[in-house]
Design a protein with these regions (language model features):
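Conserved ATPase-coupling elements of RecA-like P-loop NTPase cores
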Residues: 60-62, 87-90, 446, 523
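Residues immediately C-terminal
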Residues: 56-57, 84-85, 518-519
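Conserved short strand/loop->alpha-helix "switch" segment adjacent to the catalytic nucleotide/phosphoryl-transfer site
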Residues: 29-48
Length: 649
């Protein structure tokens, strides 16, 4: 390899900055230890690991543009205009620093504080892990006027790093194709999933520009499908995006950006007319959906500042009961983003920040920001406190309703809902319950099920839209009370009186089974909204499924076949030839018990969709848009996403 030109600066990003921490031998054997899983999430996580390198360059002030391309063969190309990965000889390893970065787990400048003060990446395994799990990877570096490249197969270099030309560009290009022998579930990248994360990164790192290009799809104008994400105001714009479908209570988004006790803190918040609390927190661009010290600091700063203002203004004088911390957060959408040099992650999924020093930094930032805003906007301040008082009154009503749910749920088996047809199996891990719309479909499901391990809970019509309902109305609703009771779920644990208690969960599979039509989809969405807002842990723990009943039965003589789509139906008709008869199932009740078992309930042949939350922030926005009060955003979403949509004016 020819000797590369070297460039010197105070904190020189060179081979000496690269520290190799661990070998790669276990990555291919135990990929889930490194990227979480080898399903859809793990596949997309590969992209995030590579993009995180570019984001680190941006955080260090050396990168402005990042491009992600989904190629026609579902390989991925990422490109940035950062300094380029160092290519000079690594003294300890005896090969190019680029090869060290690409083939040693944990190798990278992010472990060297002079190169990167903070670094993204939850697993922190870096691009070498992506290399190990790729069938093929090519790295191209533009650095100091020269172009360098190296290719790899399944993590092993095919040849030494070599110079292939000169350039006036700078940056790094990585193209990789995930290994089909590891990612056996799918190799298909979701545009929406990648767009959601890249949009999030653009908001969290204002000023950088992120391009997403999908070469699998060409638009009518001949250009590839794609989007560009860029934000000049960062979290303020992020809040506006998330709350676009909610009615604001304030003129402006309250925002703070600065450093407190050595911790860079960004906060943005706004109140709206909804009854939900929507707090989103990030550490070094990682979505910490389990919360942590930064979120507890935010809550403490918010509660202390608002209560102090309300007391000093005499706005709480007539209140006959105490205000709780929750009351200050009803109808609040907020984002907390901190940058921490050495984050300590805890919790079930390692997404809970444990650094104690961060709490005081965030609390101080929120107190200063909020105090200034309340003094400058007295009308908004009064509106917020009035909202808090209403929330407190509703909380008292909701507590009574919650207690009713609690009492009803912890009763003996005789207290189960009358319409529940239970199963005989006592082991919850082997049991499943089908939530079925209507008594007629419920009757068919009861006849068709395997009584040993399948229970049926019929629901009466469309359940309450919890997105528009006050909390006490939710807990007073009979159908929702029946769901709590049937599932054995209660509210309150030893650690948290308001947390969901799943210790007595009676079924480990909860299956939403609705008609395969528009009404059925609406009912399924209402049920999903309830689970997302009030039983999110069931989704996060992989307990919620959606059944997929067939749309058609195609017959010709003695031959019959079910179809789950129009395309499948047409293919069967073409195969059967003339004389094929088609039956369209508008509802579950149109199938007899044997057909329902064969197509939708039999574990050997059925297809069920596991409900997962890929991006909690985006999921929150979409539920709010689909089920909230604002009609125009919902209409726009349907028109953009529906294959066909008959929307009443």
């Amino acid at each position: 390899m020819s000797e590369p030109k070297e460039e010197f600066n105070k904190h020189n990003y060179s081979a000496d900055s690269i520290q190799a921490l661990e070998g790669m031998e276990h990555v291919r054997m135990r990929p889930s230890m490194y990227i979480g899983d080898v399903g859809v999430r793990g596949l997309h996580h590969l992209v995030y690991e590579v993009v995180d390198n570019s984001i680190d360059e941006a955080l260090a002030g050396h990168c402005n543009n990042i491009t992600v391309i989904i190629n026609e063969d579902n390989s991925i190309t990422t490109e940035d205009d950062g300094r380029g990965i160092p290519v000079d000889l690594h003294k300890k390893e005896g090969v190019s620093a680029l090869e060290v970065v690409m083939t040693k787990i944990g190798a990278g400048g992010k472990f060297d504080k002079d190169s990167y003060k903070v670094s993204g990446g939850l697993h922190g395994v870096g691009v070498s892990c992506v290399n190990a799990l790729s069938d093929h990877l090519k790295a191209t570096v533009y650095r100091n006027g020269e172009i360098w490249e190296q290719e790899y197969e399944r993590g092993k270099a095919l040849y030494p790093v070599k110079k292939v030309g000169d350039t006036d560009k700078r940056g790094t290009i990585v193209t990789f194709k995930p290994d089909a022998s590891i990612f056996t579930q799918t190799l298909e990248y979701s545009y929406d999933t990648l767009a959601s994360r890249l949009r999030e990164l653009a908001y969290l790192n204002k000023g950088i520009t992120v391009h997403l290009i999908d070469k699998r799809h060409v638009k009518e104008d001949g250009e590839f499908e794609g989007e560009t994400f860029h934000s000049e105001e960062g979290l303020k714009e992020f809040i506006t995006y998330l709350d676009a479908t909610r009615e604001p209570l304030m003129k402006d988004v309250i925002a703070f950006e600065g450093e407190k006790n050595g911790v860079p803190v960004e906060v943005a918040m706004v109140y709206n007319t909804s009854y939900a609390e929507n707090l989103h927190s990030y550490v070094n661009n990682i979505n910490t959906h389990e919360g942590g010290t930064h979120l507890s600091g935010f809550r403490r700063g918010l509660t202390h500042t608002l209560k102090k203002y309300a007391d000093e203004s005499g706005l709480l004088d007539k209140l006959k009961f105490d205000i709780a911390g929750d009351d200050f957060r009803e109808g609040l959408t907020a984002i907390v983003s901190v940058k921490v040099q050495e984050p300590q992650f805890e919790g079930q999924t390692k997404t809970k920040l444990g650094n104690r020093e961060v709490s005081a930094s965030v609390s101080q930032a929120v107190s200063e920001m909020l105090t200034d805003y309340l003094e400058e906007h007295p009308d908004d301040a009064k509106t917020i406190i009035q909202k808090v008082i209403l929330a407190a009154q509703a909380r008292h009503a909701a507590q009574k309703a919650r207690d009713m749910v609690q009492r009803k749920t912890v009763m003996s088996i005789g207290g189960l809902p009358g319409k529940l047809s239970d199963c005989s199996e006592q082991d919850p891990t082997k049991c499943e319950v089908f939530l079925v719309e209507g008594d007629s479909a419920g009757g068919t499901a009861k006849q068709g099920r395997d009584r040993a391990f399948q229970a049926i809970l019929p629901l009466r019509g469309k359940i309450l839209n919890v997105e528009k309902a006050m909390t006490h109305k939710v807990f007073e609703n009979e159908e929702i009370k029946n769901i709590f009771t049937a599932l054995g779920v209660t509210i309150g644990t030893e650690e948290d009186s308001k947390a969901l208690n799943l210790s007595k969960l009676r079924y480990h599979k909860v299956v939403i089974m609705c008609d395969a039509d528009i009404d059925g989809s609406h009912i399924a969405t209402l049920i999903l909204t309830f689970f997302f807002r009030y039983m999110k842990e069931l989704i996060e723990n992989g307990h919620i499924y959606i059944a997929t009943p067939p749309l058609y039965l195609v017959k010709r003589g003695a031959k019959k076949r079910y179809a789950w789509s129009d395309q499948e139906r047409d293919a069967i008709i073409a195969e059967f030839g003339d004389g094929a008869k088609i039956q369209r199932y508008k509802g579950l009740g149109e199938m007899n018990a044997e057909q329902l078992w064969d197509t939708t309930m039999n574990p050997e042949f059925r297809t069920m969709r596991l409900v997962q939350i890929d991006n909690g922030t985006e999921a929150d926005r979409i539920f709010s848009m689909l089920m909230g009060d604002e009609v125009p955003p919902r209409r726009e979403f349907i028109e953009k996403n529906a294959v066909y949509a008959n929307i009443d004016a």
